[in-house]
Amino acid sequence: MTQQLHSYFGEFGGMYVPQILIPALIQLEKEFIEAMKDISFQTTFKNLLHHYAGRPTPLTLCQNLTSGTCSKLYLKREDLLHGGSHKTNQVLGQALLAKRMHKKEIIAETGAGQHGVAVSIASSLLKLKCRIYMGYKDMKRQELNVLRMKLMGTQVIPVHHGSATLKDACNEAIREWSSTYKHTHYMIGTVAGPHPFPTIVKEFQRIIGSETYNQIQTHEKKLPDAVIACIGGGSNAIGIFSGFIDIPSVQLLGVEAGGLGLHTEYHGSSLQCGETGIYFGMKSPILQSQEGQIKNSYSIAAGLDFPSVGPEHAYLKKINRVKYVSINDEEAINAFQELSLYEGIIPALESAHALAHALKIIRKTPKKKQILIVNLSGRGDKDIITVNNALLNKEICK
């Protein structure tokens, strides 16, 4: 068997995995190509998105946040999708692929728990066994999502070594897949990892961009000035960017985790501070030491706490199609509070990074007429305790 799809985005991407996994990845690519041509598969997938997951999701105009400015700020409401985030889109597609390949079990990793919940949902629905690897630190800060996964029959496996976060959970999931690939499907949660995962996940998240393109035309009869999304691995961003990538007049902005500041060791901004290397089965920017060791990333948002990024984002940065910036923890928390207070919408901390940058733009040029769209990739129920603790600690330190 040989590859049929391009496995690189410029110099980034590839299939850097143990030789034993190459046939499994090529089989996955083959099944994906055939599924994309299969009307029955496509119909089943679209029906699940509509009747089960709740698509299309709304494009909501903020009523109060932009008061006193000439800007319009729209939110693409992936937080309203079944499961609470954009993750549900692509796990339904991958679960259908797993069934098509006659796989009986699903393994995956999760950081914020949103991907883990989504995988649990799809596995429960399609009667697949499910095991999720999750860093012990992430399990502690995302206890609600851990309970959700267990309620749906998922075995959640804590990862204690290393930084005990998403990076280490990814390593453990790939390690298990290397010995169980004949009967398991590894369900990567983002547009990272070895080929063909970045392409598959993008295809199943493309619905966000196509819906948003049509909705903004209906609302405004024109295109937005900018589309903004947070970047961890980068699937929600690739999803919404795909609807506008070929329109140069629409600025695309990816927002990384600034953590405690890019001048510190505590951030997750691999596109701005990383060096190209091999990690998680791909060639992409990585936070690494001078000796080539993978550094620990950091973000108050568990889903952005990842030391690398999807290879297509690296390519889009290199060709200057997308501008990548960072938002620190404090700015994200402020945006989290503002959206909750003024619009009655509690965003995921990950999404709050994108919102914070949008508010920066609006407040820097309050008299400018502009239309901005933020991908509200998930809801923030999971983050309320984290934010409350951060605010309490801030008060104590005053």
Curated annotation (Swiss-Prot):
Keywords: Amino-acid biosynthesis, Aromatic amino acid biosynthesis, Lyase, Pyridoxal phosphate, Tryptophan biosynthesis. PROSITE patterns: TRP_SYNTHASE_BETA (PS00168). GO terms for cellular component: cytoplasm. Pathway: Amino-acid biosynthesis; L-tryptophan biosynthesis; L-tryptophan from chorismate: step 5/5. Pfam families: PALP. It catalyses: (1S,2R)-1-C-(indol-3-yl)glycerol 3-phosphate + L-serine = D-glyceraldehyde 3-phosphate + L-tryptophan + H2O. Its EC number is 4.2.1.20. The beta subunit is responsible for the synthesis of L-tryptophan from indole and L-serine. PANTHER family: TRYPTOPHAN SYNTHASE (PTHR48077:SF3), TRYPTOPHAN SYNTHASE-RELATED (PTHR48077). HAMAP family: Trp_synth_beta. Tetramer of two alpha and two beta chains. NCBIfam families: trpB (TIGR00263). This is Tryptophan synthase beta chain. The lineage of its organism: Bacteria, Pseudomonadati, Pseudomonadota, Gammaproteobacteria, Enterobacterales.
